[in-house]
């Protein structure tokens, strides 16, 4: 089979999509043609759902491949008959090998049904595809010893299933611990390429639109385009304006009761002033219509800042929006650029590409 590399993780929320995006960028700079393959997905060909990672990767510059061509089988198919699913996965992968010099394979997400066998199944897939594995381990709120233990355990599981690990990337690590984590991974056996990438809040930040949708709200003033800007935090404006202004940070979403119309002019002026941080948007709760006088003032003062309204109460709204995660999508230009930069700065790409080129699986 042609050259390939398998990006896998032993758990969810590792930020694997950002690593895959950075690796894809490195590969497309190095070789003439790169394909994308997702062996397991919740959104197979013909589904109404979309696998966001596949949609992201096949829409990157230099990728000439349709969404359906990048899909293997669904989780449901794998649950019903794992052996048949593996056969189909290998068969569909084989249809790509003659078209591309290298194929980037992205493992499962652990967001469907995370079980103790999921990494094992990913390992079997990697082994049968002949793909060396780039292992992405979760570094958030973990110390160097915990990350090393997670890497050792996952590498052992991969080895038992005949998959070879050529790189370990600890992702979303604490900035202050990055050097210690790199040192903890440096002596992994087998000449494994290692790296530690610090957490970047932008990469998991939801858009203001996603927050509004989570609260069943709708835009009442401002720009639809600005609804797609990332919200880097949320504050509840349950205090007077001077105290709210003290708590503003760049690109924050402000939740305020819709009958607190005294706050709106001050927040809009702060957003426009240049002396306070720009906001992601304002989400008004309680369902009260904006008074006509405030609406006229708003239309005169600001042009872009989105202001949305929900019928939900402030507590329920806040409870919903703080749970919203923001995946990297094909339209997330800031996130894509950031993922490329973080990967390029933190990973020895030349060493990683050499490891991918010379490595393979024990199973053919």
What annotation goes with each model-predicted range?
Residues 1-6, 19-22, 307-322, 344, ...:
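Short, basic phosphate-binding NTP loop
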Residues 66, 72, 77, 186-204, ...:
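Ligand-binding beta-strand-loop-alpha-helix segment within the catalytic cores
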Residues 4-12, 73-82, 107-116, 131-145, ...:
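Acidic/glycine-enriched edge-of-secondary-structure segments
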Residues 200-259, 327-363:
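Non-catalytic interface/targeting segments
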């Amino acid at each position: 089979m042609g050259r390939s590399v398998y990006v896998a993780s032993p758990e969810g929320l590792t930020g694997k999509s950002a690593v895959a995006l950075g690796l894809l960028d490195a590969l497309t700079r190095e070789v003439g043609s790169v394909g994308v393959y997702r062996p397991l997905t919740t959104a197979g060909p013909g589904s109404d759902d979309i696998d966001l990672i596949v949609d992201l990767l096949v829409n990157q510059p230099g990728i000439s491949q349709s969404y359906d061509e990048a899909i293997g089988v669904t989780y449901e198919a794998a649950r019903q008959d794992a052996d048949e699913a593996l056969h189909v996965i290998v068969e569909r992968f084989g249809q790509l090998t003659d078209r591309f010099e290298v194929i980037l394979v992205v493992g499962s997400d652990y967001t469907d049904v995370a079980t103790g066998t999921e990494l094992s199944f990913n390992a079997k897939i990697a082994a049968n595809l002949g793909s060396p594995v780039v292992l992405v381990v979760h570094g958030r709120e973990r110390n160097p010893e915990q990350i090393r233990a997670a890497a050792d355990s996952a590498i052992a599981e991969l080895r038992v299933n005949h998959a070879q690990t050529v790189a370990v990337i600890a992702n979303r690590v604490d900035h202050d611990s990055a050097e210690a984590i790199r040192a903890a991974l440096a002596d992994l056996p087998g000449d494994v390429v290692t790296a530690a990438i610090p957490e970047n809040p932008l990469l998991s930040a939801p858009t203001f639109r996603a927050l509004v949708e989570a609260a069943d709200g709708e835009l009442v003033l401002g720009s639809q385009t600005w609804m797609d800007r990332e919200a880097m935090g949320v504050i509840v404006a349950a205090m007077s304006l001077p105290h709210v202004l003290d708590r503003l940070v760049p690109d924050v979403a402000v939740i305020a009761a819709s009958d607190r119309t005294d706050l709106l002019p001050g927040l809009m002026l702060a957003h426009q002033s240049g002396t306070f941080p720009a906001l992601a948007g304002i989400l008004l709760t309680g369902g009260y219509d904006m008074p006509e006088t405030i609406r006229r003032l708003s239309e005169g003062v600001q042009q872009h800042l989105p202001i949305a309204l929900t019928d939900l109460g402030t507590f329920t709204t806040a409870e919903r929006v703080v749970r919203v995660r923001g995946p990297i999508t094909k339209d997330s230009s800031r996130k894509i650029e950031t993922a490329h930069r973080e990967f390029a700065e933190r990973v020895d790409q030349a060493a990683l590409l050499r490891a991918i080129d010379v490595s393979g699986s024990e199973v053919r």
